[in-house]
Amino acid sequence: MRIDKFTTAFQTALADAQSLAVGRDHQFIEPAHVMKVLLEQTQGTVAPLLEQSKVNLSRLIDGVNKAIDSYPQVEGTGGEVHVSRELSKILTLMDKFAQQNKDQYISSEWFIPAALEAKGQLRDVLIEAGADKKAIEKNIMNLRKGERVTEQSAEDQRQALAKYTIDLTEKAETGKLDPVIGRDEEIRRTVQVLQRRTKNNPVLIGEPGVGKTAIVEGLAQRIVNGEVPEGLKQKRLLALDMGALIAGAKFRGEFEERLKAVLKDIAKEEGRVILFIDELHTMVGAGKAEGAMDAGNMLKPALARGELHCVGATTLDEYRKYIEKDAALERRFQKVLVEEPSTEDAIAILRGLKERYEVHHGVEITDPAIIAAATLSQRYITDRNLPDKAIDLIDEAASQIRMEMDSKPVELDRLERRLIQLKIEREALKKETDEASKKRLSDLETEIKNVEKEYSDLEEVWKSEKASLHGTQQIKEELEQARIELEAAGRAGDLARMSELQYGIIPELDKKLKAASQKEEQFHDHKLLRSRVTEEEVAEVVSKWTHIPVSKMLEGEREKLLHMETELHKRVIGQDEAVNAVANAIRRSRAGLSDPNRPVGSFLFLGPTGVGKTELCKALAVFLFDTEDAMVRIDMSEFMEKHSVARLIGAPPGYVGYEEGGYLTEAIRRRPYSVILLDEIEKAHNDVFNVLLQVLDDGRLTDGQGRTVDFRNTVIVMTSNLGSDLIREFSGENYDKMKDAVMEVVAQHFRPEFINRIDEAVVFHSLKKEQIRNIAIIQIDRIKKRLKEKDYQLTISDDALDYLSELGYDPVYGARPLKRVLQQQLENPLSQKILEGKFVPGSLINIEKKGEQLEFKEA
């Protein structure tokens, strides 16, 4: 018999049976070897066929294994095996059955009827497992659906829908899909398009994370519950698995063959199947090779003829990039736009999903946590969309609590380490014989007993808490399962089971859950374990994602912002008008009175050099974000040429450096919450101001690659020396008079539309002598801090402080000369004395004024 008459799948089975016989040292390939291999084929037709024919597969596998074990083992054959007489007879019968059915190739399923007709060991095993020849032949006809085997790869194309699609309606029936809340308008629109006579293929278009796939899952649930028009009832919604379709398609045309088989099976279903293609743009160009047709082109005829009922989903960008380019494909789909839900809708969606996440993580999710997830994600995570980002927050916060519950509490861990430490000490003291050691040993024994008792008590509490939490999780899982069963019973019309569940099992589980929750409440005061996701946990996750200190977000807004001036004045001496202006802008923003679509605040700081313009920015960054790193500093003197604008926002397409992005836009994309300092703004080219106009007005900027960067959470500060000579001139005059004079100079330099967009222009005063003295105290405190790290202490007398302040005072240059004076008069001589060894670590250094210089003494 010619081996090439068999299908590819059966040829593979024969080869595997041969290697099985060789591995077991058998002389012949027996039918049992082939049977074992056919049953183990992952995508074979024999196992499903036997299952449909009510054959007991586990009994059959046992029988086949026993038969293989009974064959004699022959050594010294050199791996040479032959087809046994029994197998040869079965193969001949398979050929006969194939010819009777007018098949061109012999397929695997004929092996079973042939084995049952040929009298042999395998026939007895099959009959014992419950095989019936007539039932199997009938199921073969059902499997083939009147088709003949005309290709060697025919078996691979069978049951294409089962292999290459995922049944969403089946998932909905078994309760494996998450509930879909809201989105009624989009689902109704999708159903409306599906009901059309032609072009009945909706494509859901929306930003990533707005819930396009969820809408299709919602449709599957509605089909299952019968909440759809008559035309859609009893239909199956299948999701095309592109990965399975492409995976393993090694040869040219194999991918097209598989897709053709899927389309053929769908056509046979005669409209009873709706195909869902997620990431629809992947179909355009999939399987494309030189001279070959891609998947998108293969779909067109089926879509045009109405054989294929299809729902697609893709993002706006990908739709434009791939589908709109192919006008013939685009016209076959009807667009359904999916907008991002509002915060209120997102809260409703989260409330609907809450139970699923509680069961999965085994924690309780509070309602304030849900509200916090929606509001905080909308406010702070601007580059993603609701409800996806809010769901992620809840999911991560719940997994964090679960992780804490599963690991040992910090308090227990600390006691355990302490116990180990004490026991090591006890072992060391046992070797000592002096009285002090013996006394310490007896004290140690008492301490060990106390710590052991404390540890065991705490461990007991921890175990009981853990057990109570585990109890509620188990009850919640049972309750969810009971509800899924109730829905299934309702669909099946099983009234007895429905009443048993609704009036017996579910109320009983509710009662158990209530009791377990009350027991859990008893532990709530002295918790070792957190079992609830509150707004605090959600805020913690937000801070991990966005680097905003969580305490700052949860601290009462009033308390935090009312003492803002005091905090800023710890670093910035004088300049009350500037500090108040900044504080008021931040307060307006946080109280929700300022425009949410503009930056938190935009300021123009004007004043002479060294008066604290840049220092105020640093103080603001520390106050708002706890770190100076949150300040993006750009020296505008570097942007004096017209073309340097590209450095801020990125080079346009076609230019070198296009992929790299801009300095300003990239910094804010990575850290959207920062203080932006544009130093020496008057030195920049005029075109740079044009770029800043939309940042100051709309809080947004489009970079070289067309991405919108969000500046709404930034504080923008620009500094300038314009009019500094006037500030010195008007130093004794009224502040408003001085400001008006300076603003006249500013108006001559900057365009009106630029000045008009700034929240406030603040004029800094020249520093007075007493302010320089206060700055000297701050600077010396920093030196003390650095010395403390090296284990030195420093004190300075008032005389010495006055002397340094006097030397450092310069009305023209501000506080910078003071820094130089401290360097020359204090840091230089002190570092020399430390290196000479006059002061050793641990010493207290006292600085006093002696004549016209400072004296350093060890106190």
Curated annotation (Swiss-Prot):
Annotated region (Repeat 2) at 83-146
Q: Which UniProt keywords apply?
A: ATP-binding, Chaperone, Coiled coil, Cytoplasm, Nucleotide-binding, Repeat, Stress response
Which parts of this chain are annotated as the region Linker? 341-547
**Record InterPro entries:** AAA+_ATPase (IPR003593), ATPase_AAA_core (IPR003959), Chaperonin_ClpB (IPR017730), Clp_ATPase_C (IPR019489), Clp_N_dom_sf (IPR036628), Clp_R_dom (IPR004176), ClpA/B (IPR001270), ClpA/B_CS1 (IPR018368)
Task: List, alphabetically, the GO terms of the cellular component aspect.
Answer: cytoplasm
Molecular function via GO: ATP binding; ATP hydrolysis activity
Q: Where does ATP 1 bind?
A: G206, E207, P208, G209, V210, G211, K212, T213
Main localization (coarse)? cytoplasm
Q: Where in the cell is it found?
A: Cytoplasm
Stretches for region Repeat 1? 6-71
Segments carrying the region annotation (NBD2) are 557-766
Task: From the UniProt record, list the coiled-coil ranges.
Answer: 391-525
Binding residues for ATP 2: G607, P608, T609, G610, V611, G612, K613, T614
How it assembles, according to the record, is: Homohexamer. The oligomerization is ATP-dependent.
- Family membership noted in the UniProt record: Belongs to the ClpA/ClpB family.
User: Entry's NCBIfam families?
Assistant: chaperone_ClpB, PRK10865.1
Domain comment (free text): The Clp repeat (R) domain probably functions as a substrate-discriminating domain, recruiting aggregated proteins to the ClpB hexamer and/or stabilizing bound proteins. The NBD2 domain is responsible for oligomerization, whereas the NBD1 domain stabilizes the hexamer probably in an ATP-dependent manner. The movement of the coiled-coil domain is essential for ClpB ability to rescue proteins from an aggregated state, probably by pulling apart large aggregated proteins, which are bound between the coiled-coils motifs of adjacent ClpB subunits in the functional hexamer.
Name the UniProt record assigns to this protein: Chaperone protein ClpB
